[in-house]
Amino acid sequence: MNGHGNSQKNTKNWLGLNWQLGSATGWGVLGLNMAAVMEKDRRFKPVSFAELGEIKAETNEAAGLVARLNKRSIETRHLIDGKKSGLLRCRFPVIHSLGNNVHFEGLPKMRDFDFAGSINFGICVFEKDYSNDFTFNNAAQFEVVFAGCKWNQAVLKKLGLPNTDLFLHGIDSSIFYPRPKREQNRFVVFAGGKLEYRKGQDIVVAAFRLFAKRHSDAVLATVWQNPWSISTDELGIAGHVDGSIDVDENGCQKIEEWAVQNGIPPSQIVDLGMVPNSMMSDVYDQASVAVFASRCEGGTNMVAMEAMASGVPCILSANTGHLDLMTEDNCFPLFKQSPLNTQKPKGISHWRESDVDELVEALERVYHDREEANARGSNGAKFMGDWTWERRTRPLIERIQQSIQDQ
């Protein structure tokens, strides 16, 4: 299908969000929070082009917003009129999610049906840099491409693209803020992010394995479940761990079993499974420290941002998108960043490997000097005070509105 569909008479002030909204993925959380700000702002009515049916409301506060989004989503399905492939050209502007596909001919997507707006904008978060003519041509199709971190924007600007802007993502300050710490007998090392080579969980396991031998009260608490397939070959490529990991009958990775196989005592590892975003604050409340040893971040690592906003002392790899989160005293940076020892550097030559010993030293520093750790955690929370979804999304709304008015 290529056209305007059956009817677009009631689409005044609509602004399409061309990806799946929800709480299960970073993109989903991003979209829901952007939509909430847009609803409050009232210049645009956000429209979710949902692929997987209705969005589910996790909290009573979100129920009204989700109901409106689902209602508009149903209306977009009427515009499609049952077609399963093709392109619907909308009479309203659309924001598109862009990832590593921005580097490939034709901007390939994982679905047969797509939407195009009267004006098109992109939010671009890529981890692999295959910069080429396709990157330029794809990005040039959009009125504005909002990069998810300064590193992403620098890559696009280096290609000579004049239409880039920055959209650093936000946090929900009504959920993620410092709370009084619970009394507990364990030193809880939290590590989050879907399990994959890029996120550096193998580095965390290697470091905690050493740390745990010195501190029997330490426990590694993980939120590492990955709903997508994992390359076990990649997990073990750096030599820190055996990458082979089993899944249970529900398709969930057996994180605890994998950690034990890689040398962590059973009493010092707990995997919390798939935790809804609205409940992550309970996890951060129990954390003594949070560790993020990513080899690359195309955005600014939403889980790290939430942990910082909650006042948790954070250890961050000093590379790519993480650099946007760092000041002199708001976290514990891992500065020893080495090129990857891999035979397949294409697209990942900018990725960096954190040093296991430096990570162990950072954990020891937090363990032995809680005063410094608490001060850095407090500074991190203050820093994230400027990163609310409202403060981050309003400039994007302004830029989009101005671009539309300039047409």
Describe the residue ranges of each PLM region.
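Acidic donor-binding loop of glycosyltransferase active sites
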Residues: 285-299, 312
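A charged, aromatic-enriched C-terminal amphipathic alpha-helix characteristic of glycosyltransferases
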Residues: 354, 358, 368-398
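Short alpha-helical donor nucleotide-sugar binding micro-motif in glycosyltransferases
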Residues: 277, 282-287
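Conserved donor-binding/catalytic core segment of Leloir-type glycosyltransferases
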Residues: 16, 182-199, 205-209, 220-222
